Amino acid sequence: MREVLKEEGFAPLPRRLDEERPDYPRPTVEPVADARAFSLEPRSFTTRCGGLFLFVPELVRLDLEKMAAALPGSKMIPAAHALRASLALKLWSIERKSHVMTLAADEGLALFAGLNAIPKKSYFSEYSSRFGHAQTTRLLAAWQEQLAGAGLLRGESFNLDFHSVPYYGESPQVERHDVSARSRRQASVLVFLAQDADGRAFCYSNADIRKGEEAGEIFRFIDFWKRTRGELPRHLVFDSRLTTYAKLAELDGLKIDFITLRRRSPQIMKDIVCLPRSAWRTVELDISTRKYRTPRVYEQTVRLHGHAFRQLYVQDLGHEDPTVLLTNQRRTSAKQLITRYAHRMLIENALSDAVRFFHMDALSSAVGLKVDFDMALLVVASGLYRLLAQRMRGYSDAQARHLFRDIIDIPADITIGGGEVRVQLHRRSHLPIILASGLMDQPFAVPWWNGLSLRLTARDALKPRQT
């Protein structure tokens, strides 16, 4: 319009004043996150993230403030507040840091962290840059220390695995690894994870791994466990790609029991084919849900790097090729060995849940050390979900995404006043399970709320209209 008037010789129209402009929604300016501006003045509001407050009793019991003591922080956002805010993103299944902007105005999310407002995407991106591997390891060690009395990590046996997080950028520092989901090698960040076999929770992670260091990562986990628990891991289960035969000999020298697979080389396949039928014996597995419960087994002793190991050929497990198990457990029956290795699928299921719910494959950076902190958050968040699952009747084996869908994803009305914070969960079909968990029986004092207590309640049923 300005150009048309100019061509016709007219002067430009004067700019309208703000009060002359039409009334339409304009961008709002949200406050900057600052713990010093955190207020617990009496007020009421509604939050989309009501289910997050179900984790608060566990965070109080596990003393998150102590866990965050050695982490980086500032006067505006102290270390404990930064850790709670970062955990909130994981617990609420926020895929990328930029997606937090959709919840920037949610007062409930800020209250959970103990801040006046939730930090913005730029803060979360910058915060992980302040972590080195030593600090991330200290966070995991503190998490282990706080979980010692929770019964979640028994430490009897561990499932170990690598996971390659795909990278689609152009950074030359990102190395190529096997990505099992795509059955090919591509640029990716390699992550090592350890899972407690009984508690089904991750207990260790490391994303600061370069090519050539993979075989020794199992010993870094052993050193970590010894430092935090004062003893060596008792039993490890992993696949054939995790380490080398030389490292297996070292494990045997440390008297650590293990079960692993051996790669089916042409010579091994030839030996299996040449075995007479009478050499095989049938065992029955005590797994009622398994289709193939009567595999055939042949056992022998092999020497690798000067150490004797038990080697089991296993057929009729539902695979076209036989399975080759290798172990240093000399007194355990073949049936127990096969059953225990079959339970290694628990870490595969946990990795699937981590990818689908905790968005493990949504790479936060091309820098492995930044990914390292993100994986440590995954370890803590998955542990909190396992602890909550133990409280919920019928959900002890549920994966995080199932628990989130049924239990956590609930809005709530929050009222601050009278010396407490009252979180009134909206009605949902699974609300009776929360009521039966005991979380609503009594209030919990929350340290980062200046001594105020959290009281979880359920919204009353709608009263019938009177006519």
Per-region residue spans from a language model:
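Basic, amphipathic alpha-helical segments enriched in Lys/Arg and hydrophobic/aromatic residues
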Residues: 361-418
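Acidic, metal-coordinating catalytic cores used for nucleic-acid/nucleotide bond scission
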Residues: 236-245, 264-267
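An anionic, glycine-rich sequence signature occurring as long contiguous blocks
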Residues: 25-45, 249, 254-350, 354-356, ...
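Dynamic "connector" segments at or just before major functional cores
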Residues: 18-184, 191-211, 218-223, 227-228, ...
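Conserved short alpha-helical interface segments
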Residues: 1-19
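Generic beta-strand/beta-sheet core signal
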Residues: 103, 161, 195, 207, ...
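Short amphipathic alpha-helical "interface-anchor" segments enriched in bulky aromatics
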Residues: 100, 334-373, 381-385
